[in-house]
């Protein structure tokens, strides 16, 4: 599979809203457990044999596999990515509006609407329209909570100032409680380290 990333037990995703766990189990356990259906359970089979099983809960995905699971298989990779992607999208549609509404009440500053959608450019982490709609990309839900809050407060600042001139940065700093320009350095470091992997999971 020609990609920089392979989803396997070395992938560590542990955030404030989502943990991905990996569990190597005996093949007999995997085959017997896969017979039973329950909420949030998915299995990948080859013929009549379960190769890997996923259990998706509120803020956690657990993958169960055996020693001969072929993680470099293209179909298994697609299955794994879809499991993770769908959970991230579900969480984004729940948690990001919830976090925005929290800050709206805290700051007594309200958007007309919050919309969760993928941005056209990767380096755009949020937008505020002239109609006071705030757009947030789903991928940021797995960012650290502090960084999500900075992104949300940045867009809320645009409810007052639709530019990036001095007034905007002063107001953003007021909402944030510290120098907002320092956020850009922190965001750049995180973007360089993690953004490509998250984009891969959500493609």
Where are the language model's segments positioned?
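Active-site-proximal or metal-binding-adjacent scaffold patches in catalytic folds
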Residues: 1-150, 159-203
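Walker B catalytic acidic pair
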Residues: 155
